[in-house]
Amino acid sequence: MTAGKRVSRKAGKGVGAVIETAGEVIRTRLGHRRPRFAVVLGSGLGFFTQRMTDTVTIPYAEIPGFPATTVIGHGGELVVGKIGGKEVLAQSGRFHLYEGHEPNVAVLPVRTFAALGIETLLLTNAAGGIRRTFATGTVMLIADHINLTFRNPLTGPVQ
C-alpha cells in the first residue's frame, strides 16, 4: 500500500500490515527517538506543535495508509518533539467518519501509536455543551456522548 491510499474496509488482516508498515516508516524517520506519550490535537490546538522543540515532522502523505486531512486547520502531519524536556508525538489533524473514512481509517493513527510503543495517549477535540456556563475554550472531561453515527464502536474483532 502506498502513502495516502485508503485502507479498505475489507482489508481484514491487511489492516495489521498497514499498521506495521506505517510504524516502520515512522520509526525510520524518528531514528533513535521513541516517544512514550502522544497527543491527538483537536480543532484549534494546532499551535501546540509550534511550542515543541527539536522537532521531526512527518507529513501524512509519507505514511502508508494515512489519508490527507480535509478539515481546515488540521495540519496533516505527525510532529515529534520535546515539551518540558519530555519527548511527545503530536498528531496534527485526524480523520473523521464525516469525511467519508471508514472507522478502521479513523483509528489507524491510534493503532499505529500503540504499535510504536506509545504508553499514554491524550485525546482532544472541539465539543459543544448544553450548559450556558460553558464558554469557548472551557476544558471539559467527557463522560458520555450522543452517538449519531448509528455505528457501534465496539463491533469487529478484538486484537
Where are these regions (language model features)?
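Metabolite-binding pocket within alpha/beta catalytic cores that recognizes anionic/polar moieties
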Residues: 2-159
